[in-house]
């Protein structure tokens, strides 16, 4: 029987983690995403066109305030924490909540989630949301194009 997984996130790393680890894994079933930080994202679906063949209806996105109810309702085995810009205190509070509700609390490491480039790569990262990664990426891409390089930008999907 497939492990039932819920992914917590903020419309970023959560979708990346899904695509790199769970999307094509028949031994897991991602039953839901939860989200916070992004206005009006709850009650939407991660689209079937991005979710892949195992998820023909896409995956529902719920407000994170429903986490405990969702763990129980969907008999979740593992909750994957997929934020990258929150405090240690917040992470551990969520871990306690998840485990008290009966699920495992999972943090995916870089070896499981990093893309494996076959060409020279530049990564634009930041310590929190909204600090200018997109603008910086455009500037770096422009400079590389001006230097005669072929440039491709890779970004996680947004529903």
Indicate residue ranges for each PLM-predicted region.
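Hydrophobic anchor at the start of a short beta-strand
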Residues: 30-31, 105, 149-151
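Cofactor-binding loop segments of dinucleotide-utilizing enzymes, especially the Rossmann-like FAD-
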Residues: 10, 35-36, 110, 127, ...
């Amino acid at each position: 029987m497939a492990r039932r997984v819920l992914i917590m996130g903020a419309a970023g790393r959560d979708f990346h983690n899904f695509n790199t680890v769970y999307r094509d894994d028949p031994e897991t079933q991602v039953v839901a995403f939860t989200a916070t930080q992004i206005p009006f994202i709850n009650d939407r679906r991660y689209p079937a066109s991005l979710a892949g063949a195992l998820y023909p209806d896409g995956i529902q996105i719920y407000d994170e305030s429903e986490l405990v109810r969702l763990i129980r309702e969907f008999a979740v085995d593992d909750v994957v924490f997929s934020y990258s810009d929150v405090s240690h205190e917040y992470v551990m509070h969520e871990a306690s909540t998840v485990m008290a509700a009966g699920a495992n609390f999972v943090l995916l490491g870089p070896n499981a989630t990093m893309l494996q480039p076959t060409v020279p790569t530049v990564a634009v990262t930041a310590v929190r949301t909204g600090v200018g990664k997109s603008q910086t990426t455009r500037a770096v891409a422009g400079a590389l194009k001006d230097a005669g390089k072929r440039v491709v930008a890779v970004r996680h999907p947004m529903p």
